């Protein structure tokens, strides 16, 4: 496995998997991934440098309200989640609830568009 393949594999990991990987690397090599305090500099400079790096890559799609057309929204929720009729109905009836978590921005926008087309109120976090 070369460097590019390793990087690609890391890109495809979920956040929880990345946390486990970092812990395993720390244990294996006896190091810490925490940045030393002396290297950070002033808190203001550290915060300014960290802000652009923290761009969100995974999003949660939250159904805020099913609207007047619950049956059509229910069908879309079942299509998106793969839930059974009862589970999807319970989810739609107990808004606000997350429909899909940890998805890409593009997928979140597509899900939001499908649900809003049926009259639902949707939020992406």
UniProtKB/Swiss-Prot annotation:
Ribosomal protein found in the keyword field: yes
Assembly and interaction partners: Homodimer. Part of the ribosomal stalk of the 50S ribosomal subunit. Forms a multimeric L10(L12)X complex, where L10 forms an elongated spine to which 2 to 4 L12 dimers bind in a sequential fashion. Binds GTP-bound translation factors.
Name this protein carries in UniProt: Large ribosomal subunit protein bL12
Organism this protein belongs to: Dictyoglomus thermophilum (strain ATCC 35947 / DSM 3960 / H-6-12)
An individual GO BP term: translation
Assigned protein family: Belongs to the bacterial ribosomal protein bL12 family.
SUPFAM superfamilies recorded: ClpS-like, Ribosomal protein L7/12, oligomerisation (N-terminal) domain
Pfam families the record matches: Ribosomal_L12, Ribosomal_L12_N
InterPro entries reported in the protein's UniProt record: Ribosomal_bL12, Ribosomal_bL12_C, Ribosomal_bL12_C/ClpS-like, Ribosomal_bL12_oligo, Ribosomal_bL12_oligo_N_sf
Presence of the UniProt keyword Ribonucleoprotein in the record: yes
